[in-house]
Each structure stands twice: as C-alpha cells, then as structure tokens.
C-alpha cells in the first residue's frame, strides 16, 4: 500500500525517524491537486481520486500545517480500531471548539468523552429497554400521516423530503420530549435545515484551513453554505435548549417521561468534582446529547430515506423483489414491524446496499487528530496531526466489494438467500471503532421501519422522460442532489 512516488515529507517530529520510515506523499497547497482539495465541489470524490494518484495515505499542506488523509479499509481500520487510543482526539480547529458543536459527544476526547459516552449510553439503554412497542406505535402513526399526504396529492412527482423530515422530527420530538409536533412546530419546520449541515461543515473547515489572504475569496464562493451551517446548527441548539428548559420546570427525579428525563438523571449522577474537573455538565450531557439525537437521527434518517426511495424508483426490478417479500411476510392486513425484520432478508439487503452505494457517511462528522506520535503501516505521523478519514473509500474498496460502483442488493445475501453477516461486517454506515455512532441500533430501526412501511404502501417510479440522478451533494453525510419521484398507492 506504500506509494513510492516522489513527494515532500511531513514536517519533522521530535523523533528523528527520517532514515527508518518511508515518506508520506505530500501535496502542496499551490499545486493543482492542492487547489482541487481546497476549491473543488465534490470533496468525497476529490480525496478518493487523490488516493488513486498518491496512495491510500497522503498529506495536504494547509495554512495550519499538514493534514493526513487515510483511505481504504486497511488504513481506516488500522487507525480507528487497532490504534483507537491514538487516532481519537479532536483536531485543533476553531470550528470544532465553538458552541454548540463543542458540547457534542462526537467532538470530545479523553476522560470527558469517556464520562459523557458512558452516561449517555446508559440513558439511551434504560429509555429504550421497555419502550419498543410504544416506539413502533409512534413511528407507524407518523408513517400513516406521510401516506395520507402522498395519497392525496395524486399522480404528481415530488421530493419526499418535506413529509419524511417533518414526521421523523415529530417522532424524535416524542422520544425526546414525550410529545409529537403541534401546529406551531409544523408551521416553523424547515425540512431543508439539516441538509445544509454536512456540506456546510466541510466548507467551514476548508475556509479555516485556507491562508488568510484567500479566505475572503473562498467565502465569496462558499459563504452561503458556511452561513447556513452556522445558523441551522444554532437553530437546532436553540430548539433543543428551549424544550430542555421547558421539561426541567416539572422534572421529578426518579420519574421518567422521556429521553430528556433520563439524561437529567444521567447529569445528576455525575458528581460536582468530576463535572468541574472535566468541564462537563447539563449543556453537554442533556442539551448536547439531545441535539445529536435530533440532528443525526433526523438528518441521517431523512437522508437515508430519500436515497432509499430514489433507489426503489431507479431500480424497479429490485423494488418488485422487496415488495414481493413484504407482501409474503407481512400481508395486506399488517404493517412491517420489528418482529418481521428477521424474515425480510432481501429488504434488509436492499437497505444495506443503498447505504453502501450512496456512501451516506462519507467521513466522520468531525476531524480527529493523533494524540501521540505513531506509526501507521510504517509511516510516521506526529502527535497532533489532523486527519481526514475517507469512509467513502471503504464503499469503493475493490478488496472488499466486487464491482463496487454497481448497485447489487444481492451482494448482502449468502448462498441460502439469508442476510450475510460477513458482508455486513464490511460496511460501516454508522462508523467503526470507539467513535462508532452511539445511536446505531436506534438509527437502524428508524431506517428499516420507515423504509419497510413506505415500500409496503407505495410503488415508486421516476417520472416519464426524467433521467435518474444519483449524484450527491458532498459533505460528511452525502445528501441526494435531487429527488423527483412518483408514489402510487399499493394498498
């Protein structure tokens, strides 16, 4: 995997390993490739294309020093799993150290991260352990509302984002604050707000890494995305903070109405000395955690559903197989629920292939850095080196996937037509290693249930004369550039 092309070396560390380690291929800022890295539109495709030229590990010059890009399953797994104690601190970027994002679990490190993760995980586990039947009822109610709107609009094409995002947000509001959206929440809801965050983060980070004399020019090109990232993230924080304060007014310790109450209890379980020493408290444990539930749960759930419905419409032969399985297992008188999931291997395989092929999580939602000097496949990486982790490259890694650019749901089935655990073990839509998404189980439930119920109720198609468009808007999560489909009721 080492690249022998002539390239500049990383700046010297306090350890003199020049004669012992190979040189990491380096891309200067002023080079054509460096300019593409900073100015190009499709960032996930750019870093992937650079790996074809420089190898699966390379560095890029920035105004704040070199940043190392890791590509391919071997390097990403080595960093995030085998050396998870090294590749696990937040990069020293201003964009990661300001509110509200600095309060997110994803952007913490060390003992602060360990304490936050432990109490957050316990709260999630305790909340969900006895509520799955209720949660399924809540989800089905929201899906029925989506179906009513789509049936009423008739034979017109549409983007499913409005109803899917709105009803998913309402469902999560119920989980977090024990109430569905009311008329006021519906009236102010902006279904596009979360879609701006993935691309806005990438551009906010690149803006910060630009030389000062070029930042104004960069802002002229990408300022709209940067501003919407900031305003929508702050809006999400304000929404969560308002509801946390409202719930706190009548919170009674030991009485649990919703996830918010479990997080109040989690915050109370951390002693004052620990809170002071680690700079952790209600803003992190309650508000930060719920903001991630609302943002990641609502955003990724909606992004995944737009992709999944688009793929159903784009590949009618696969849609027919999904619906045949749903009809045989569920029938007309029931709706797909968690109890049916094990008997729906093709439906699960279709979802898994959608998440792989669209590469929904193209990179972690934050830039990490090395906590100490380390070697990766013989390459020396100094302490404090920021990283770009290219998850997209895993979905296109030819050592893992045959014909990775093709959409083939059957790749996730074994010879007996059952879901292949081996193939599932190669796909990481929720990340891998210590930083793997804490809400993975809940996220998978949301995506599977939404998809299965909507695919059971509707047949989706591309409007006549319209070309299939599977292009993504680049970001830490990949969002469909355009979804324009029709939905015909099946039941």
UniProtKB/Swiss-Prot annotation:
Annotated binding of heme, by residue: 437
Superkingdom of origin organism: Bacteria
Pfam families recorded: p450 (PF00067)
Similarity-based family: Belongs to the cytochrome P450 family.
GO biological process terms held by the UniProt record: hormone biosynthetic process; progesterone metabolic process
PANTHER family noted in UniProt: CYTOCHROME P450 1A, STEROID 17-ALPHA-HYDROXYLASE/17,20 LYASE
Cofactor: heme
Name by which UniProt lists this protein: Polybrominated aromatic compounds synthase
Function: Cytochrome P450 protein involved in the biosynthesis of polybrominated aromatic organic compounds. In the presence of ferredoxin, ferredoxin reductase and NADH, catalyzes the coupling of bromophenols and bromopyrroles, forming various polybrominated biphenyls and hydroxylated polybrominated diphenyl ethers (OH-BDE). Can also mediate the heterocoupling of 3,5-dibromocatechol. Can also use chlorinated phenolic substrates. 2,3,4-tribromopyrrole could be the physiological substrate.
Species of the source: Pseudoalteromonas luteoviolacea (strain 2ta16)
Record bears the keyword NADP: no
Keywords: Heme, Iron, Metal-binding, Oxidoreductase
Database matches in Gene3D superfamilies: Cytochrome P450
Known EC number: 1.14.19.-
Membrane is among the record's keywords: no
Gene: bmp7
GO molecular function ontology, one term from the record: steroid 17-alpha-monooxygenase activity
Traits of the deletion mutant: Deletion of the gene abolishes formation of the dimeric compounds 3,3',5,5'-tetrabromo-2,2'-biphenyldiol, hexabromo-2,2'-bipyrrole and the hybrid bromophenol-bromopyrrole pentabromopseudilin, whereas the monomers 2,4-dibromophenol, 2,4,6-tribromophenol and 2,3,4-tribromopyrrole can still be produced.
């Amino acid at each position: 995997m080492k690249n022998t092309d002539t390239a500049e070396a990383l700046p010297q560390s306090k350890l003199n390993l020049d004669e012992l380690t190979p040189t990491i291929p380096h891309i200067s800022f002023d080079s054509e490739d460096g300019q593409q890295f900073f100015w190009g539109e499709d960032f996930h495709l750019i870093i992937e294309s650079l790996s074809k030229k420089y190898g699966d590990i390379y560095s890029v010059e920035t105004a704040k020093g070199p940043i190392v890009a890791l590509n391919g399953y071997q390097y990403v797994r080595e960093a995030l799993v085998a050396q998870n104690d090294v590749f696990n601190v937040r990069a020293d970027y201003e964009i990661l150290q300001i509110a509200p994002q600095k309060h997110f679990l994803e952007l913490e490190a060390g003992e602060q991260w360990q304490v936050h993760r432990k109490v957050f995980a316990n709260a999630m586990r305790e909340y969900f352990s006895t509520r799955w039947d209720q949660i399924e009822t809540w989800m089905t109610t929201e899906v029925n509302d989506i179906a009513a709107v789509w049936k009423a609009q008739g034979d017109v094409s549409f983007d499913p984002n409005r109803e899917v995002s709105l009803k998913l947000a309402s469902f999560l509001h119920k989980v977090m604050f024990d109430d569905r959206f009311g008329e006021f929440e519906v009236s102010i809801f902006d279904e596009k707000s979360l879609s701006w965050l993935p691309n806005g983060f990438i551009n906010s980070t690149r803006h910060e890494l630009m030389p000062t004399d070029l930042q104004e020019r960069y802002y002229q090109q990408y300022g709209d995305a940067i501003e919407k990232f900031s305003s929508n993230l702050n809006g999400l924080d304000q929404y969560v903070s308002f509801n946390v304060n409202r719930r706190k007014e009548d919170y009674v310790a030991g009485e649990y109405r919703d996830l918010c109450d479990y997080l109040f209890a989690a915050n109370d379980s951390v002693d004052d000395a620990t809170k002071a020493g680690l700079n952790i408290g209600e803003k992190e444990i309650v508000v930060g955690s719920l903001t991630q539930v609302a943002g990641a749960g609502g955003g990724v759930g909606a992004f995944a559903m737009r992709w999944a419905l688009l793929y159903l419409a784009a590949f009618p032969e696969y849609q027919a197989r999904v619906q045949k399985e749903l009809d045989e297992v569920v029938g007309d008188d029931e709706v797909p629920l968690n109890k049916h999931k094990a008997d729906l291997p093709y439906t699960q395989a279709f979802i898994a292939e959608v998440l792989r092929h669209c590469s929904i999580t193209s990179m972690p939602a934050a830039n990490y850095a090395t906590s100490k000097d380390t070697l990766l496949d013989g390459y020396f990486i100094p302490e404090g080196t920021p990283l770009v982790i290219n998850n997209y490259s895993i979905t296109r890694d030819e050592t893992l996937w045959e014909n990775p650019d093709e959409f083939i749901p059957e790749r996730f089935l074994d010879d007996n037509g059952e879901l292949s655990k081996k193939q599932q073990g190669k796909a990481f839509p929720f990340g891998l290693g210590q930083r793997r998404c804490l809400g993975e189980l809940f996220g998978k439930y949301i995506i599977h249930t939404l998809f299965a119920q909507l695919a059971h109720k509707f047949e989706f198609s591309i409007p006549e004369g319209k070309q299939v468009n599977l292009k993504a808007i680049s970001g830490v999560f990949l969002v469909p550039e355009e979804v324009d489909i029709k939905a015909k009721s099946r039941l």
